[in-house]
């Protein structure tokens, strides 16, 4: 990238890529990334413990949270009402 310094057009490629300011900026960039990464993980954990709501008019201010799903029923599916299966073949009933 070209920039102007003291009335002269200079190319930034003439500077060393390993100058001290680049190294320190790179270090602080990585440090901020790590801090923000763990901060977002902890914020999600806090939201889960609080019932995922920051408003004071929530119904679940005591920390209980919303009610969970009902337990799954095991066994045959009875809620599909359809025709009965045909009788088994073989016997004529005589």
Curated annotation (Swiss-Prot):
Transmembrane feature ranges: 20-42
The keyword Nucleus is annotated on this UniProt entry: no
Pfam families registered for this protein in UniProt: SelK_SelG
Gene Ontology CC annotations of this record: endoplasmic reticulum; endoplasmic reticulum membrane; Golgi apparatus; plasma membrane
Subunit structure, as described in the record: Interacts with DERL1, DERL2, DERL3 and SELENOS. The SELENOK-SELENOS complex interacts with VCP. Interacts with ZDHHC6.
Region (Disordered): 48-94
BP GO terms, sorted: calcium ion transport; endoplasmic reticulum calcium ion homeostasis; protein palmitoylation
Topology within the bilayer: Single-pass membrane protein
Chief location category: endoplasmic reticulum
Record keyword DNA-binding present: no
Protein role: Required for Ca(2+) flux in immune cells and plays a role in T-cell proliferation and in T-cell and neutrophil migration. Involved in endoplasmic reticulum-associated degradation (ERAD) of soluble glycosylated proteins. Required for palmitoylation and cell surface expression of CD36 and involved in macrophage uptake of low-density lipoprotein and in foam cell formation. Together with ZDHHC6, required for palmitoylation of ITPR1 in immune cells, leading to regulate ITPR1 stability and function. Plays a role in protection of cells from ER stress-induced apoptosis.
Subcellular location: Endoplasmic reticulum membrane; Cell membrane
Keyword vocabulary terms for this entry: Calcium, Calcium transport, Cell membrane, Endoplasmic reticulum, Ion transport, Membrane, Selenocysteine, Transmembrane, Transmembrane helix, Transport, Ubl conjugation
Family classification: Belongs to the selenoprotein K family.
PTM per Swiss-Prot/TrEMBL: Cleaved by CAPN2/m-calpain in resting macrophages but not in activated macrophages. Macrophage activation up-regulates expression of the calpain inhibitor CAST/calpastatin, resulting in inhibition of CAPN2 activity. Truncated SELENOK proteins produced by failed UGA/Sec decoding are ubiquitinated by the CRL2(KLHDC2) complex, which recognizes the diglycine (Gly-Gly) at the C-terminus of truncated SELENOK proteins.
Species this chain originates from: Sus scrofa
UniProt-annotated site: Cleavage, residues: 81-82
Protein name as catalogued: Selenoprotein K
């Amino acid at each position: 990238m070209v920039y102007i310094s003291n009335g002269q057009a200079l190319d930034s490629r003439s500077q060393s890529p390993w100058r001290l300011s680049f190294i320190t900026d790179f270090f602080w960039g990585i440090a901020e990334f790590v801090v923000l990464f763990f901060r977002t993980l902890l914020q999600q954990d806090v939201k889960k413990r609080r019932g995922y709501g920051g408003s004071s008019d929530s119904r679940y201010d005591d920390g209980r949270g919303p009610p969970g799903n009902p337990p799954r029923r095991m066994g045959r599916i009875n809620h599909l009402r359809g025709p009965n299966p045909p009788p088994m073949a073989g016997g004529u009933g005589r």
